[in-house]
Amino acid sequence: MPKIRIKLRGFDHKTLDASAQKIVEAARRSGAQVSGPIPLPTRVRRFTVIRGPFKHKDSREHFELRTHNRLVDIINPNRKTIEQLMTLDLPTGVEIEIKTVGGGR
């Protein structure tokens, strides 16, 4: 059974969820089955920086960068599904990775 797997990445979870919802609606309008959006683990990168430029090593500041991930599977896509996905306008700040899974002959 052919399947399109779409991975979404971004720093803002609200924008990411809105983008995933747009993809799900477009796929359902074309008649394909949709699984997701499935939230994947959030990657958290933490940075510790010394506040002062010269000394005062005990005074530090902590920053973190959260990368949120979502997964959407489109099962049995047709030509209309692919056309809908190609014309979809998604906001900036969302990275999209599209793969085809299964359906190999």
From Swiss-Prot:
A GO MF annotation of the entry reads:
structural constituent of ribosome
PROSITE patterns, per the entry: RIBOSOMAL_S10
Cross-referenced Pfam families: Ribosomal_S10 (PF00338)
Superkingdom to which the source organism belongs: Bacteria
Which Gene Ontology BP terms does the record give?
translation
Q: Which SUPFAM superfamilies match?
A: Ribosomal protein S10
Question: Coiled-coil annotation: which residues?
Answer: none
Query: Keywords of this protein's UniProt record, alphabetized?
Result: Ribonucleoprotein, Ribosomal protein, RNA-binding, rRNA-binding
Query: One GO CC annotation, please?
Result: ribonucleoprotein complex
Q: From the record, give the transmembrane residue ranges.
A: none
What InterPro entries does this protein's entry cite? Ribosomal_uS10, Ribosomal_uS10_CS, Ribosomal_uS10_dom, Ribosomal_uS10_dom_sf
| Subunit | Part of the 30S ribosomal subunit. Forms a tight complex with proteins S3 and S14. Also contacts protein S9.
Matching HAMAP family: Ribosomal_uS10
Q: What does this protein do?
A: Involved in the binding of tRNA to the ribosomes. Part of the top of the 30S subunit head.
NCBIfam families, from UniProt?
PRK00596.1, rpsJ_bact
Assigned protein family:
Belongs to the universal ribosomal protein uS10 family.
- Record PANTHER family: 30S RIBOSOMAL PROTEIN S10 FAMILY MEMBER
| Name of the featured protein | Small ribosomal subunit protein uS10
Protein source organism: Thermus thermophilus (strain ATCC 27634 / DSM 579 / HB8)
